[in-house]
UniProtKB/Swiss-Prot annotation:
Entries under NCBIfam families matching the protein: rpmI_bact
Species name: Leptospira borgpetersenii serovar Hardjo-bovis (strain JB197)
Disulfide links within the chain: none
PROSITE patterns registered for this protein in UniProt: RIBOSOMAL_L35 (PS00936)
Name of the protein this chain belongs to: Large ribosomal subunit protein bL35
Gene Ontology molecular function: structural constituent of ribosome
InterPro entries: Ribosomal_bL35, Ribosomal_bL35-like, Ribosomal_bL35_CS, Ribosomal_bL35_sf
HAMAP family (alphabetical): Ribosomal_bL35
Entry-linked Pfam families: Ribosomal_L35p
Family assignment from sequence similarity: Belongs to the bacterial ribosomal protein bL35 family.
Length: 67
């Protein structure tokens, strides 16, 4: 059986944690930040976890990311 290819777009956007949860960057942080308050911008700064319902589809894109 041939090697599976990793989707490069997904590999750049997602990282796996030690417990196989998936981290992603928060959305709404690219532009038009002037109308967003400082508290909201601070909250959006960090990484968040991907929802469990999306986990399976992301794992299919990154077959070697899961431990």
């Amino acid at each position: 059986m041939p090697k599976l290819k990793t989707n490069r777009a997904a590999a750049k956007r997602f990282k796996f944690t030690k417990n196989n949860k998936i981290k992603r960057k928060s959305m709404n942080t690219r532009h038009i930040l002037t109308k967003k308050g400082p508290k909201r911008r601070r909250r959006l700064r960090g990484l968040t976890l991907v929802n469990n319902s999306d986990w399976k589809s992301i794992v299919r894109l990154m077959p070697y990311g899961v431990r």
